[in-house]
UniProtKB/Swiss-Prot annotation:
GO terms for molecular function: ATP binding; pantoate-beta-alanine ligase activity. It comes from Frankia alni (strain DSM 45986 / CECT 9034 / ACN14a). Disulfide bonds: none annotated. This is Pantothenate synthetase 3. It is an enzyme of class 6 (ligase). Its EC number is 6.3.2.1. The reaction proceeds by a bi uni uni bi ping pong mechanism. The gene is panC3. ATP binds at residues 31-38, 154-157, 191-194. Keywords: ATP-binding, Cytoplasm, Ligase, Nucleotide-binding, Pantothenate biosynthesis. InterPro entries: Cyt_trans-like, Pantoate_ligase, Pantoate_ligase_C, Rossmann-like_a/b/a_fold. (R)-pantoate binds at Q62, Q160. One of its GO terms (biological process) is pantothenate biosynthetic process. One of its GO terms (cellular component) is cytosol.
Length: 294
């Protein structure tokens, strides 16, 4: 039976009870508007942990002033129904004031914030100033509240996963950060709550992002690191030709977000892309290792 919890005290009471019974705890953190990608994380936690908690919180401090906080989809009752079907044990759905009692609504208003340097200086970091600081500040707080053993993150938002993994390691937290494969629609589009922003014409274009990134990853797998510059340029040109409004970046990094330098094994590389299409900002990535020998 799904327990719906709204206060920090209720969550801590529940996790203490589970701990006393010797249960392990897995946590999936979301902003709601759940889809099969989120639910696959619940399934992964269910397989590996005795108890599963999902957090459902649209975190205001990870949004910039001109971003989509106000229109981000909120489907709480549908989310609860989906979690009951997946046999999730508890959902923590706090009010904004519960997590930020001082009235913080932007990262620059937060008294104590968590900054992961280096990993947030590439890819989405420069394009969304303060975004990752807002993510890590809220996630660290949730980890302290939920007291889980394992936390599960999708590889679609790979930079977010890498940043959270680094934060947990740097803080010495006794939590394992578990990456999970990106869930995709039948045409290859990565599942995302923001896909609802796309109209039918844009939805037909959107899968071409992953297709282009995969082709680039395959070329790097076949021809090596020396073709990265030419390959990323060609991907960006292809995406614009296919109808995307803006290509924010197409870049290649290692799985730990290090640079692709001479001597780096191609199997360690990923091709990352971010584009704008209508009112949606779409992210995806392709692992070169998946294309080796393909």
């Amino acid at each position: 039976m799904l327990r719906v919890l709204h206060t920090i005290e209720d969550v801590r009471e529940q996790t203490r009870e589970w701990r006393a019974a010797g249960s392990s705890i897995g946590c999936v953190m979301t902003m709601g508007a759940l889809h099969e990608g989120h639910l696959s994380l619940v399934d992964a936690a269910r397989r590996e942990c005795d108890k599963v908690v999902l957090t459902l919180f649209v975190n205001p401090i990870q949004f910039g002033p001109s971003e989509d906080f106000d229109r981000y989809p909120r489907t709480e009752e549908a989310d609860f129904r989906a979690l009951r079907d997946r046999e999730c044990d508890a959902v923590f759905a706090p009010a904004t004031e519960t997590i930020f009692p001082l009235g913080e609504r932007r990262i620059d208003q937060v008294r104590t914030k968590v900054v992961v340097r280096g990993l947030t200086d590439v890819l989405c970091g420069p394009r969304r100033p303060g975004h990752f600081d807002g993510v890590t500040t809220e996630v660290l707080k949730m980890l302290h509240i939920v007291d889980c053993d394992r936390t599960y993150w999708g590889e679609k938002d790979y930079q977010q996963y890498a940043v959270i993994r680094a934060m947990v390691e740097d803080q010495g937290l006794p939590v394992k950060v578990v990456p999970c494969p990106t869930m995709r629609d039948v045409d290859g589009l990565a599942l995302s709550s923001r896909n609802t922003y796309l109209d039918s014409g844009q939805r037909a274009i959107a899968p071409r992002l992953y297709a282009a990134l995969r082709r680039g990853a395959r070329r790097i797998a076949e021809q090596g690191i020396d073709v990265i510059g030419e390959t990323t340029k060609q991907i960006a040109e292809t995406l614009l030709a296919h109808g995307f409004d803006l290509v924010e970046y197409v870049e290649v990094y290692t799985g730990s977000l290090g640079p692709a330098v001479a001597g780096t094994p191609v199997e360690e590389l990923r091709v990352f892309g971010a584009v704008r299409l209508g009112g949606a900002r779409l992210l995806d990535n392709a692992a070169v290792a998946d294309e080796v020998g393909g």
